[in-house]
């Protein structure tokens, strides 16, 4: 199931400049999500990282993966109108392989590894041109607002 930006905004609370998922290509309910983030030279982060050679900070890639995993969590919920929010709970095994620069398209994939009550663990991978740019184990928790 594909998702437009408008549908993503109904699921994720993030907004510009911190909404880091542009489109969802595929969702397997409660298990997996494949999404896109187009990297524009107009991203605010490039004003300081780095002005002479723009490189997307690794923390932004990790956040994009966490948002993609958040879509997985919400896709598995029966009641999407509840007042709960997904929070970042931890990160393990983060590795950054290649720089991500303006003009790149990040393909974000998150797969559920484990879930217990309101705590989820995902494997996340970000690719550019089919090359692994970053990977990490993402830990998220669902909490009431």
Question: Which residues does each PLM region occupy?
Answer:
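HotDog/MaoC-like acyl-thioester-processing domains
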Residues: 13, 101-104, 111-145
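Beta-strand-rich interaction surfaces with strong enrichment in secreted/lumenal proteins
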Residues: 9, 52, 96-98
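Catalytic strand-loop segment that frames the active site of acyl-thioester-processing enzymes
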Residues: 16-56, 61
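Hydrophobic beta-strand-centered segment that forms part of the acyl-chain substrate-binding groove
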Residues: 1-2, 69-107, 133-135, 141
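Active-site helix/loop of acyl-thioester processing domains in fatty-acid/polyketide metabolism
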Residues: 24, 56-80
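Conserved positions in beta-strands of structured domains
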Residues: 22-25, 92, 97, 111-113, ...
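Short aromatic-glycine motifs in intrinsically disordered, low-complexity regions
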Residues: 5-15, 82-83
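Beta-strand residues in well-ordered beta-sheet regions across diverse protein folds
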Residues: 34-36, 109, 123
């Amino acid at each position: 199931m594909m998702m437009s930006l408008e549908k993503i905004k109904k699921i994720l609370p993030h907004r510009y400049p911190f909404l880091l998922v542009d489109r969802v290509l595929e969702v397997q309910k409660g298990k997996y999500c494949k999404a896109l983030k187009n990297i524009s030279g107009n991203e605010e982060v490039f004003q300081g990282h780095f002005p002479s050679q723009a490189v997307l900070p690794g923390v932004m890639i990790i956040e994009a993966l966490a948002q993609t995993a958040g879509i997985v969590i919400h896709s598995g919920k029966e009641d999407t109108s509840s007042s709960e929010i997904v929070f970042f709970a931890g990160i393990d095994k983060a590795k950054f392989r290649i720089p991500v620069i303006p003009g790149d398209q990040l393909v974000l994939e998150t797969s559920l590894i484990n879930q217990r009550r309101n705590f989820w663990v995902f494997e996340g991978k970000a690719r550019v041109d089919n090359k692994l740019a970053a990977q990490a184990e993402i830990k998220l928790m669902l909490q009431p607002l």
